[in-house]
Swiss-Prot record:
The gene is gatC. Heterotrimer of A, B and C subunits. This is Aspartyl/glutamyl-tRNA(Asn/Gln) amidotransferase subunit C. One of its GO terms (molecular function) is asparaginyl-tRNA synthase (glutamine-hydrolyzing) activity. It comes from Clostridium botulinum (strain Loch Maree / Type A3). InterPro entries: Asp/Glu-ADT_sf_sub_c (IPR036113), GatC (IPR003837).
Length: 95
């Protein structure tokens, strides 16, 4: 399989793109290099290779939900740069 200049012109027309003749020639050359590389990959025997990633076999890894001691409210308020009673004042993020 190879890409011709006519193929590049057709796709460019569909995408409403305009290219110089030199650019078209470069595209033909680059696309043919890619296709040749893919053909080489097709020759590779992968019968004995295990599937490395398959989204159908991925499982969620859940952790235990353990309650742990956290900071006391007074300690949080004392460490906050600004506070209003029991609330920490933070800079405005969204206008």
């Amino acid at each position: 399989m190879s890409v011709s200049k006519k193929d590049v012109e057709y796709v460019a027309e569909l995408a409403r793109l305009e290219f110089k003749e030199e650019e078209k020639d470069n595209f033909v050359n680059d696309l043919n290099k890619i296709l040749n590389y893919m053909e080489k990959l097709d020759e590779l025997n992968t019968d004995d290779v295990d599937i490395v990633v398959n989204p159908y076999y991925i499982e969620n890894k859940y952790r235990e939900d353990n309650v742990e001691k956290s900071m006391e409210l007074k300690e949080v308020i004392d460490n906050a740069p600004e506070n209003l009673e029991e609330y920490v004042i933070v800079p405005k993020v969204i206008d």
